[in-house]
């Protein structure tokens, strides 16, 4: 993979957004995660949180765009937690600033996303829950390169989703495997 092929626009699903909030002190400030935290009991849990930390450190330097959608916010609203909503709105504000950096708002996207998203109505994506399908559709429409999730189930269909929709669906560890070798150049 060359530097120009590094996936730089990343859609955060609600599980990733929630993890960023829950472990923000570790991810953004280098704080500690206590030994009794439940992340240690989740297979690859700490590794994914550590990868999120590395990803966000690279992203701070402006080389990544982190995207959310109205459907993302709806999932946050459904949780009914004000602190989570406030966090999501902060992340949405960051995404809006990424979009504002384009002189012509339309240049941030392409018509290809509309055609690819239309494929989601076909039976071949029946394994997606309604919520996942909405978020994947949003990510494709927003021309995201990566759909980042903490879930284990959705990445099992990553090859099919990438082949059909041109989006990589992965956990943070997988994304860091792609991004890490180039991190110093993205600074």
Regions found by a protein language model. Give the residues of each.
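Short, flexible loop segments at the rims of nucleotide/cofactor-binding pockets, characterized by
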Residues: 42-45, 122-128
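Acidic, PIN/NYN-like endoribonuclease modules and their adjacent C-terminal/linker elements
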Residues: 2-11, 24-33, 125, 136-187
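Short, aromatic/basic amphipathic alpha-helical patches
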Residues: 82-95, 156-164
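Acidic donor-binding loop at a coil-to-helix junction in glycosyltransferase catalytic cores
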Residues: 131
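Short boundary motifs at domain starts and secondary-structure transition points
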Residues: 1-4, 56-58
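Acidic catalytic patch
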Residues: 93-126
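Alpha-helix capping/helix-boundary segments
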Residues: 16, 72, 134-135, 153-154
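PIN/NYN-family metal-dependent endoribonuclease catalytic core
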Residues: 12, 20-84
């Amino acid at each position: 993979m060359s530097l120009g092929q590094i996936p730089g626009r990343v859609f955060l699903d609600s599980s990733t957004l929630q993890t960023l909030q829950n472990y923000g002190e570790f991810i953004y400030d280098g704080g500690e995660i206590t030994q009794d935290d439940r992340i240690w009991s989740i297979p690859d849990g700490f590794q994914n949180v550590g990868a999120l930390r590395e990803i966000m450190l690279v992203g701070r330097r402006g080389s990544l765009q982190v995207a959310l959608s109205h459907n993302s916010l709806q999932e946050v609203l459904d949780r009914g937690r004000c602190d989570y909503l406030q966090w999501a709105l902060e992340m949405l504000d960051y995404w809006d600033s990424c979009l504002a950096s384009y002189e012509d708002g339309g240049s941030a996207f392409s018509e290809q996303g509309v055609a690819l998203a239309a494929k989601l109505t076909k039976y071949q994506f029946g394994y997606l829950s309604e919520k996942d399908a909405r978020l994947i559709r949003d990510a494709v429409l927003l021309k995201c390169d990566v759909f980042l999730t903490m879930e284990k189930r959705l990445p099992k269909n990553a090859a099919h989703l990438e082949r059909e929709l041109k989006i990589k669906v992965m956990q943070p560890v997988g994304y860091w495997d792609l991004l890490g070798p180039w991190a110093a150049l993205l600074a």
